[in-house]
C-alpha cells in the first residue's frame, strides 16, 4: 500500500549533564574546580528530496529520537554533542501539528530543510560557577530535555500532468503508452491502487526535460465524500499543473461517456472549487473500438455538450492519437 500519510512523535536529544570535578595534580593538592559542561542534544531536521516518493521508510514507526548529548568530563572537557537526526521526505510533503492541525511547513521544493525539534542545552559543570567569592563551587546542572512534538506528514504528489478518470477508463494503459513503462492493467475496478509517477518525453523540443505524469487511482461518484479510494487520492490532484481526464468513449453499462465526464468534473469541483480553474485536456480513449464515422459523431456530441473543453481522441492500446496529445502537452505546459 502506498504510504502517503503518517503520524509520528519526534523527540530531540537531551542535553548532557554538567559534572563536578577537581584538579588533581602533583603540586596542586587543593586544585580548583575542573568539571566540564554537557553536550547539546541532537536536533531533528526534516529535509525534502526528489529521490524519495513516499513515507515507506517510516512505516510502523511510532516515534523517532535524536541522540542525547554526553555528560561533561574532568579537565574542563565538554561532553560531545548529540548527532542530529535527519528525516528525508518527498517533495510535496505537508507538515502539520497533530494537536492544533496547524500547517507547520510545506516542503514544495527539493532540498528544503526545517529544524522541527531542537536538542536540549547541556548542563553546566562546576567550573562555570567559579567566582571571586566562591573559589570551589560544588554545583553542576543537569542537561535540558529536547523538544518533543507529534506531527503528521501528508504527501501531495507534485507532477506536471495528472491522469484522472473512472476505473476501467483505460488510464493505466494510456499511462504505459505515454511513459513507456509497465503499470498493471486489468478489466476490473481499481487496477491502480496507488499513485504512480512516470516521465513523458517531449517529442517536439529536443532539450525540453520530460513531463512528470501521475496516474491517480480511479475516481468514482461520491469520491469527495470518501467513497471508493476517496479523499486519500483526490488530494494528489491539487499539485498537478495540468489535468488529463480520461473517458472511455464507448461508455459502460451504467452510464454514457458524456455522463462520466460530467460526474468527474463535479467530483473535483465538490472536493475543491478552485480545481475547476486548473487547466485540463479531455482524452476520449478506446477509439479503436469504434468505426471512423462513429468516432466523429461522438466527438461532435461532446463538443456540443462541453463547448469550452479541449478534446483529443486516442487509443492508449494502439497509440493512435498519442502524438497529438503530446503536442498538446507541449503547448499547454511550455509557458
Swiss-Prot record:
Pfam families: GTP1_OBG, MMR_HSR1. Residues 159-334 form the OBG-type G domain. Its cofactor is Mg(2+). Its main location: cytoplasm. Disulfide bonds: none annotated. It is found in: Cytoplasm. The keyword Glycoprotein does not apply. An essential GTPase which binds GTP, GDP and possibly (p)ppGpp with moderate affinity, with high nucleotide exchange rates and a fairly low GTP hydrolysis rate. Plays a role in control of the cell cycle, stress response, ribosome biogenesis and in those bacteria that undergo differentiation, in morphogenesis control. Belongs to the TRAFAC class OBG-HflX-like GTPase superfamily. OBG GTPase family. Monomer. This is GTPase Obg. The lineage of its organism: Bacteria, Pseudomonadati, Chlamydiota, Chlamydiia, Chlamydiales.
Amino acid at each position: 500500500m502506498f504510504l502517503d500519510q503518517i503520524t509520528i512523535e519526534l523527540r530531540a536529544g537531551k542535553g548532557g549533564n554538567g559534572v563536578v570535578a577537581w584538579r588533581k595534580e602533583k603540586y596542586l593538592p587543593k586544585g580548583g574546580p575542573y568539571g566540564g559542561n554537557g553536550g547539546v542534544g541532537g536536533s531533528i531536521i526534516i529535509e525534502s528530496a526528489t529521490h524519495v516518493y513516499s513515507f515507506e521508510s517510516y512505516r510502523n514507526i511510532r516515534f523517532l529520537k535524536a541522540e542525547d548529548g554526553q555528560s561533561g568530563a574532568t579537565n574542563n572537557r565538554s561532553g560531545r554533542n548529540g548527532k542530529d537526526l535527519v528525516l528525508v521526505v518527498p517533495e510535496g510533503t505537508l507538515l502539520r501539528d497533530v494537536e492544533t492541525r496547524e500547517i507547520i511547513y510545506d516542503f514544495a521544493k527539493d532540498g528544503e530543510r526545517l529544524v522541527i525539534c531542537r536538542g536540549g542545552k547541556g548542563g553546566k559543570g562546576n567550573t562555570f560557577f567559579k567566582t571571586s567569592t566562591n573559589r570551589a563551587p560544588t554545583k553542576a546542572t543537569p542537561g535540558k530535555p529536547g523538544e518533543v512534538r507529534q506531527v503528521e506528514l501528508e504527501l501531495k504528489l507534485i507532477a506536471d500532468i495528472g491522469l484522472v478518470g473512472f476505473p476501467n477508463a483505460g488510464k493505466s494503459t494510456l499511462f504505459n503508452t505515454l511513459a513507456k513503462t509497465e503499470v498493471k492493467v486489468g478489466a476490473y475496478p481499481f487496477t491502480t491502487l496507488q499513485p504512480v509517477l512516470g516521465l513523458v518525453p517531449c517529442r517536439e523540443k529536443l532539450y525540453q526535460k520530460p513531463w512528470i505524469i501521475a496516474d491517480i487511482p480511479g475516481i468514482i461518484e461520491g469520491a469527495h465524500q470518501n467513497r471508493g479510494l476517496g479523499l486519500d487520492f483526490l488530494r494528489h490532484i491539487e499539485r498537478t499543473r495540468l489535468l488529463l481526464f480520461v473517458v472511455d468513449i464507448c461508455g459502460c453499462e451504467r452510464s454514457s461517456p458524456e455522463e462520466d465526464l460530467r460526474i468527474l468534473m463535479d467530483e473535483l469541483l465538490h472536493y475543491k472549487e478552485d480545481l475547476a480553474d486548473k487547466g485540463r485536456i479531455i482524452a476520449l480513449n478506446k477509439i479503436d473500438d469504434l468505426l471512423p464515422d462513429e468516432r466523429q459523431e461522438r466527438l461532435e456530441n461532446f463538443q456540443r455538450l462541453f463547448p469550452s473543453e479541449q478534446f483529443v481522441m486516442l487509443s492508449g492500446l494502439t497509440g493512435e492519437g498519442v502524438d497529438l496529445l503530446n503536442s498538446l502537452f507541449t503547448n499547454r505546459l511550455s509557458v
